[in-house]
Amino acid sequence: MAVIKSALELALERTKNLQVDESLQKASEAKLEGRKAASRWLEEPESVDFKALAGAIPPEHRQTFLRAAFEVLSTQVQLPLNTGIDKAKLEAAGKAIIVLCGLSSRFGSEREAKLAQQQVQSLFQQILQFLGQYSEEMKRAEQAIRNQWAPKLKEKERQLAAQLGQNVRIDPMSDPEFAEFYRKNIDAMRKNYANALEEAKNQLAALCGFATNE
C-alpha cells in the first residue's frame, strides 16, 4: 500500500529544496564576486580591498569567493606565447594571491596564515624565475633549430637558384619540412615547461587551501 505524504511533509520537503537552492545561489554569487574582484585588481589594484570584500560575503561562502579570485589571478601565470613575459602583471597577480592566502579559512591562526604567505611569496618568486628561464630557453632553442636546419635550407635555395637562374631566399617557416621539425621540437619543449608550471600552480593552490578538492 502506497504511503500518502501529509501536507506538512510535502511542505517541509519544499522548504528543504528551497534552502538548498538558496545556498547554491549564494555560492554562485560568491564565486562571481570573487572573479569580478580579481579582474578589477588586475586593471586597478588600488581599487580592490580583498579583506573588506571577503568580509561582506557570508562566512560559509567566503572560501568560495577567495578560491574564485585565486583562479582568475592564477590564469595570469602561464607560458608566454612569444618570448617575453609581462612581469608587471605577473607581480600584481602574485601580490593579490599572497593577500588571498592570508584570508583563507584553512588557517587556524594568524601565525599559520603568515607562514603560508611567506611560502607562497617564495614559490611565486621561483615561478617568475622559471618563466624568465623559459623565455631564454625558447630563444636559444629556436636559434639552435635554425642553425641545425641551415645547411638543408641552403641546399634547397641552391637547387631552386639553379632551376630559376637567379638567387632564391627561402623563409624557413614557409618550408613544410622545416616547419614540421620546428613545431615538433618547440611543442615538446613547451609541453615540458607547461607541465612543470601547472604543478607549481597546484602547489600555490594547496598552500592556500584553494585546491579544487578542498
Pin down the residues of each PLM region.
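Intrinsic-disorder-associated interaction segments
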Residues: M1-I4, A27-K31, E43, P58-P59, ...
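Generic alpha-helix signal with a bias toward terminal, lower-confidence helices
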Residues: K16, V20-A27, L53, V77, ...
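Long amphipathic all-alpha helical oligomerization modules
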Residues: Q143-E214
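Alpha-helical context
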Residues: S6, R14-N17, E29, R106-E110, ...
